[in-house]
Curated annotation (Swiss-Prot):
One of its GO terms (cellular component) is cell outer membrane. Residues 23-257 are annotated as: Non-LT domain. Residues 1-22 form the signal peptide. Residues 451-460 have a biased composition (Acidic residues). It comes from the Bacteria. Its main location: membrane. It comes from Shewanella baltica (strain OS155 / ATCC BAA-1091). The active site is at E302. GO terms for biological process: cell wall macromolecule catabolic process; cell wall organization; peptidoglycan catabolic process. This is Membrane-bound lytic murein transglycosylase F.
Length: 476
């Protein structure tokens, strides 16, 4: 009996110590040699243009690839079904496509940390009766198949049994919003951020009742073999959150689109079609190092592209220059469109060059525009004030908070240059950013319709007035 027990125990120990052969490829993930990111096209997700790639998800993906020290490969898909299948088949490493957290996605995938929040809203067009709720509709809802909107409608149908909708697979969210504006469909559902961005180009869009509130936008990872990537993503997310990157990207893509003026947006789109062609070449010629569309957007904010514009304060012309500024940069006739554009471009380029190198390239234009509006000295006051409040003086998102304080005695009495209408400067910059985004969209649409047209190189042919010739204390 003793020998039998000994043999049994020995056999068990030998078995326990024996190396088990497994297919390691099934359990151990291969080291990434590149980060393959599946995505969808959209202005807040991923877009390509002559000015480079952009989008909240794209910018974060670039940073994540840098964090992992591997090349980034963006892999766009035309619909969600293909995107999901690609992730399940290990053709991509993750999905970064502006997708919200939903019960169905939690069951199928691993969800990354929250990037930002959105509401789901019912969308209709200007001129239709405003629906009070989902049961008060005068037409049919059309949504994208396999989207979170289908999940929302399915839940609502439990309370509204007569609720029906159409699902389509060959369109994306942007196309459905365009179909609303063009009266091709009655209603759709969209994320609030998408509506805010797209109504700059489609001003007839209207947001109706909120169907789901404060949904987290997340990245999707495979349900298995993604432990290492998830841990790296969480560490990266914590790093970027502490660094203020998420706040910066939220401000970059969404901070200037919340304010919306229906009449102004329609008027701007008409002006792009009817007025801008007369002056486009001048903007391209004199932009210098600027994107000519930013210069044109600034001019529209200043004068609505009216070369004879005047104000009660004495500023005049396409770029609304003051007499001292015009004299200093050699502009003799502020009401001459070309002279005014040349002078305004010179001033803006000068402001950009004067800014401290610590301000990131992507944000220098917004600081320069604020200087163009209220003067460089007041912007410097605001930067110092931001620093004293433990905010980042080199981040536009923080300067936006501080500039309005220059109107309050409690704060401006501590500054070198005193009172300034800082809230006006914030509104000024945000308006130009909205005009610029709209102009870029219209310009890109035109290039798609006329691909044989080459972009103009005139901007590089005639240099702007040399930088460093303007007084930093004065606004334009």
């Amino acid at each position: 009996m003793t020998r039998f027990l000994f043999a049994l125990i020995l056999g068990f120990l030998l078995t326990a110590c024996q190396q088990v052969t497994v297919d390691e490829t099934e359990f151990v993930p291969k080291k990434l040699t590149e980060l393959r990111v599946g995505t969808l096209y959209g202005p807040q997700i991923y877009m390509t243009s002559g000015q480079g790639d952009s989008g909240f998800d794209y910018d974060m993906a670039v940073l994540f690839a840098e964090y992992l020290d591997v090349p980034l490969k963006m892999v766009p898909y035309t619909n969600r079904t293909e995107l999901y299948e690609a992730l399940k088949k290990n053709e991509i490493d993750l999905i970064a496509a502006g997708m919200t957290e939903t019960p169905a996605r939690r069951e199928q995938f691993r969800l990354g940390p929250p990037l930002y929040r959105v509401n789901q809203v019912l969308v209709y067009r200007e001129g239709m009766p405003a629906p009070k709720d989902i049961s008060d509709l005068k037409g049919k809802i059309t949504v994208i198949a396999d989207s979170s909107f289908v999940e929302t409608l399915t839940q609502l149908q439990k309370h509204y049994p007569t609720l029906v909708w159409d699902q389509i697979t060959d369109k994306d969210s942007e196309e459905l919003l365009a179909m609303i504006a063009n009266k091709e469909i009655d209603y759709t559902i969209a994320d609030s951020s998408s509506v805010q961005i797209n109504r700059r180009y489609l001003p007839d869009l209207r947001s109706g009742p909120v169907l789901e509130e404060k949904l987290d936008v997340v990245w999707l990872l495979p349900p298995t073999r993604s432990d290492e990537l998830m841990s790296q993503l969480l560490a990266f997310w914590h790093q970027e959150k502490l660094a203020g990157t998420l706040d910066h990207l939220n401000e970059k893509y969404f901070g200037h689109v919340k304010r919306f003026d229906y009449v102004d947006t329609r008027a701007f789109i008409r002006a792009i079609e009817t007025v801008l062609p007369r002056y486009r070449q001048l903007f391209e010629t004199h932009a210098g190092n600027l994107d000519w569309r930013k210069l044109a957007a600034t001019s529209y904010q200043e004068s609505h592209w009216n070369p004879h514009a005047r104000s009660a304060t004495g500023v005049r012309g396409m770029m609304m220059l003051t007499q001292p500024t015009a004299k200093e940069i050699g502009i003799t006739n502020r009401l001459d469109a070309e002279e005014s554009i040349r002078g305004g471009a010179a001033y803006l380029n000068d402001m950009i060059n004067r800014l401290p190198e610590s301000i990131p390239e992507s944000q220098r234009m917004w600081f320069a525009l604020a200087s163009y509006n209220i003067g460089y000295a007041h912007v410097e006051d605001a930067r110092k004030l931001a620093e004293s409040m433990e905010l980042n003086p080199n981040a536009w998102r923080d300067l936006k908070k501080v500039l309005p304080l220059l109107q309050k005695r409690k704060y401006y009495q501590k500054t070198r240059y005193g009172y300034a209408r800082g809230s006006e400067a914030v509104h000024y910059v945000d308006s130009i950013r909205r005009y610029y985004d709209t102009l870029v969209w219209v310009d890109n649409q035109s290039k798609q319709q006329n691909p044989e047209e080459e972009p103009s190189d005139l901007a590089s042919e005639e240099p702007a007035i040399p930088a460093g010739t303007l007084s930093p204390e004065q606004p334009k």
